[in-house]
Amino acid sequence: MLKGVSLYLVGMMGSGKSTVGRLLAEKLGYGFVDLDALIEQVSGKRVGEIFEREGEAVFRDLESRVLAEVSAYTRLVVATGGGVVLARRNWGYLHHGVVVWLDADIETLLGRVEHEPGTRPLLAGGDRHLRLVELLGERARLYAQADVRVSAAGLPPAVAEETLRCLAARLAEDSAP
C-alpha cells in the first residue's frame, strides 16, 4: 500500500502512538521505531531525566537529531514524541513519509496517562487535566498539518485498522486523476 514509504505517527501523549505503531508495523511488514526509546538508547538517559537535568530545549534538539537519522530509512513505522511537531525543521524530516495524527479527546488521554505516573515529564506536578488541555491547545494546529487524521479513542487494534483504512482512502485520492 505505502510502497516502502515510512509512516510517522504524531499526537498527544497517551494517544497510543507506540502501541498502535507496533500493530501497524506488523500489519505492513515494516520495522518499528519508538523515537523516545531510541533517544534514551542514544543518550543513555531516560527522557524524564533529560528534561529534569538538561531541560526541554536540550531534549528537543536531541529529538530533532535522532529524527533526522531515522528519516533516512524507509519501511518504518515511527512513533514520535508528542512535541515533535513543535520544531519547524522536524516537519522536513516527517515529510519523508506519511504523517498520521492519532487524535484523542482529553478524557481519553487523561485516562491513559494516569496509569503511567512519573513517565510524562511535561505532566509532572500540578493538574494533569489542565496541562493536557494547555498542551493540546498549543499543538492541535500543528498536528492538523498531518496527511491523515485518525480518531484514537478506541482500542489499539481498532485504531490500527482505522489508520490503514484512512491511509488507503488518502492514497486513492492522491492517485486519482
Curated annotation (Swiss-Prot):
Mg(2+) binds at residue 18. One of its GO terms (molecular function) is shikimate kinase activity. CDD domains: SK (cd00464). Its cofactor is Mg(2+). Substrate binds at residues 36, 60, 82, 139. Pfam families: SKI. One of its GO terms (biological process) is amino acid biosynthetic process. The keyword Amino-acid biosynthesis applies. GO terms for cellular component: cytoplasm. It is an enzyme of class 2 (transferase). Binds 1 Mg(2+) ion per subunit. It comes from the Bacteria. The keyword Cytoplasm applies. It is found in: Cytoplasm. Monomer. This is Shikimate kinase. It comes from Gloeobacter violaceus (strain ATCC 29082 / PCC 7421). The gene is aroK.
